[in-house]
Amino acid sequence: MALSTSSPLPLYQTPEIDGNTILLKVPWYPSAELEWCWAASAQMLACFFQGSLTDQCKFANLLFSGQDCCASPSACNQPIDLNEVTKLFESFDKSATFLSNPIEFEDIQTEISAGRPVQVGYQWSDQSNHVAVIAGVSQDNVGSLVYVNDPDPQFGNGWVYYSNLRLAYGDGTWQWTWTVNP
């Protein structure tokens, strides 16, 4: 899933909040390879759920059988089919529901409140795809915020308004969602 070359995320590191903030301890990791947003997102989620670090290349090995992505990561530096993302969840003993649409802020709140991060998929304006992880929710006097762990180092992690996330930070649209099954 290609990374965008758009401007940095309009992050709000210290939002004025109303006490309804929930932030899960999902670690942030950058993509080890340009096309590995999916592997970095899986790494974040696996570390959150299992408490141990799995190399991104091992997630690539799961999907590119016959290749040693740890010895030669550039050979595996490619996007994956969206249907393969659920296999990554299974690798850390979770199942996920794939939705071909964004979910409402209230639904994200429900997931985060239950201790389940949400994975989102964007389609950039150039038609390439990208995934990231929502790890928190909050509200300020302007609107609803989500805490995004975006594996693209130019975006990183931080607070962004939900309305801006729906527009893939102004450079596309949020098209897909993966929720972790209880």
Model-derived features with residue positions:
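Sec-dependent, cleavable N-terminal signal peptides
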Residues: M1-A2
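Active-site nucleophile-adjacent alpha helix/oxyanion-hole segment immediately C-terminal to the catalytic cysteine
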Residues: L9-Q67
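Conserved active-site-adjacent core of cysteine acyl-enzyme catalytic domains
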Residues: P8-L11, A60-P182
